């Protein structure tokens, strides 16, 4: 059974169109013009138990609206979603015991309480038995290394410490599904690595299903089993990182270092379709569609055109592919 099941999910918002000027304002007040905006359009997908799904898209793509429906904050206009067999909008008090939510830019911790006291309050909110609470705290202390600051007030924690503390708070009641929204935002490289290792360990040891939204594409590449990408509320890709690269990573780059004194020479490939030439000093970069051109032919021809000191092949990485999606180049 899928841990997350989404079928034909739709969310519409109605907004009032205001006309400019005093007359327009009066007209809008007396006879307001309404427009329907489709934030999420007919989304359908499933996430099996234990999978880490990267749920990504540009700003305004509909990610936050979808997450709010999955967590029960918003009610769908049509369609439905089930988390662990439960409809999020039905009996929310029972449903929230199955999920954990972390928002990178907002904390669920009490600012003036010591972190340990915060966890004690959450224990009562989620009705966690004493025996399970102590077991969970031991596990979370080990995975997230909370011991050094667990007695400190939350307001004194660094951003990295607070993020670890927030993740622990969301996992205290042992949820089956964890929603992570930008969990590494604003963190330095070493802290990001620690957070990623902790997420991976939690996923592997507890089979926690994780839905991750992030603009840090290193999070996607290092954590996710699968990518679900949306744009304007609609699905545009669903598959693994390797499938994304195979499908859209056809553009490759050959980088040549030329022997000096050849600025007057021109590449044989100047002006050809599906090929971009970038020439700066003694550096020559040829970006090409690998489904149309063979790298061996390009190397052979370029060796004929120029005297080459060095060359290397650069594959298109996931960051470049997704950036092209956002720019509508793919």
Where are these predicted regions, by residue range?
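Conserved ABC transporter NBD signature motif
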Residues: 79-90, 95-96
